Amino acid sequence: MEFSRDAGMMMENKRNVCSLGESSIKRHKSDLSFSSKERKDKVGERISALQQIVSPYGKTDTASVLLDAMHYIEFLHEQVKVLSAPYLQTVPDATQEELEQYSLRNRGLCLVPMENTVGVAQSNGADIWAPVKTPLSPAFSVTSQSPFR
Amino acid sequence: MNSSSLLTPSSSPSPHLQSPATFDHDDFLHHIFSSTPWPSSVLDDTPPPTSDCAPVTGFHHHDADSRNQITMIPLSHNHPNDALFNGFSTGSLPFHLPQGSGGQTQTQSQATASATTGGATAQPQTKPKVRARRGQATDPHSIAERLRRERIAERMKSLQELVPNGNKTDKASMLDEIIDYVKFLQLQVKVLSMSRLGGAASASSQISEDAGGSHENTSSSGEAKMTEHQVAKLMEEDMGSAMQYLQGKGLCLMPISLATTISTATCPSRSPFVKDTGVPLSPNLSTTIVANGNGSSLVTVKDAPSVSKP
């Protein structure tokens, strides 16, 4: 009788082990599905955001958005190169020091923190350049500056 | 006396018969004497040995010994019965033990059977997984999906090369980096474009700078100079690398003329920005030099270094 009872206990233990394995497998599957769903949602949101910046009226599938992003970044690099070319061309050959040769200030460029640049970029360029054209009369410049601000 | 008389007849027949056999019998008798039930049997059998001692013949003596043994057994029914029962009970333990071992073997066989059944159940579970994982699906939908994933992976790698901090492996983080970099480049292009729009005002800017020539030149920190040096060098080699470097530093490339215009525009009205206006004072002087250079006059170019020297 004792041995038969022990056998029954062994069987119960094995059944418990099997059930634990099954539950662990289920949890693993559920974790995978949950994480995969979250990842898909995150990636989808980011693809949409990138599309809005790169090609708002272009195709919406992931491969097309990535391709447009590649082309757009290369285009922006070319734009920066073209817009900065006039400053780079004015290299003072008279100075022989390498440090001065590679300095930005001799070329009319400077580095500004992006925080200060965002406000400038958001505003209309014409508003910034207008006061400079009328520096002769201080009173007029003051009156002209007030409506812009 | 009885005991001594018993001992003497045992010693007397020994020379007559074989000594080793008799010695063995004596040893056996000693063992019997050592056992506990023997004294009680001796006490009970006191009168019969005397009657047996009357015939002194050896043969009779042997018969007497056998008779004693035979008589002893029935006389001590209780003790031998107990001994037999004890023997059976002690014997039952080993009998049960093999039964127990038999039970263990049965449990082991059941365990092996359940293990085999478990294996059988596991096998069909693994087989479809193996097929699904290893098998290269050939239906057109699966092939198209595979090509789509490969295309996306290739383009993601190409974008990693264009973007700073491209070493991230998480797709979501990689996309965040791409978005931030595109926004930075758009900002940079806009700032440089504004300076282009203001190109016509360069003359007026020169006039204002000549008026402000009296401003003192503030020396910038060595670290800033090194950063400017690095940016200028990178712009000569590769614009992409320069832009990535600037975004990493949190800086934006801006023409000095634009910075000067902004500082002059904000200087008269807002006093809190005096510190900010102090920063672009040094660019004024460099702008003056550059403006002289832009004048396209050789004499002015020669004058510029002479001014910079002192």
Swiss-Prot record, chain A:
CDD domains (alphabetical): bHLH_AtbHLH_like
Protein name: Transcription factor bHLH153
UniProt-annotated location(s): Nucleus
Domain bHLH residues, every copy: 27-76
Record keywords: DNA-binding, Nucleus, Transcription, Transcription regulation
Single annotated GO MF: DNA-binding transcription factor activity
Chief site of localization: nucleus
Assigned protein family: Belongs to the bHLH protein family.
PROSITE patterns: BHLH
Gene Ontology cellular component annotations, sorted alphabetically: nucleus
UniProt superkingdom: Eukaryota
Lineage per the UniProt record: Eukaryota, Viridiplantae, Streptophyta, Embryophyta, Tracheophyta
Transferase keyword on record: no
From Swiss-Prot, chain B:
GO CC annotation, single: nucleus
Organismal lineage: Eukaryota, Viridiplantae, Streptophyta, Embryophyta, Tracheophyta
Keyword DNA-binding: yes
Primary gene name: LRL2
Residue numbers spanned by region Helix-loop-helix motif: 150-185
Protein name per the record: Transcription factor LRL2
MF GO annotations: DNA binding; DNA-binding transcription factor activity; protein dimerization activity
Chain segments carrying region Basic motif: 136-149
Subunit structure: Homodimer.
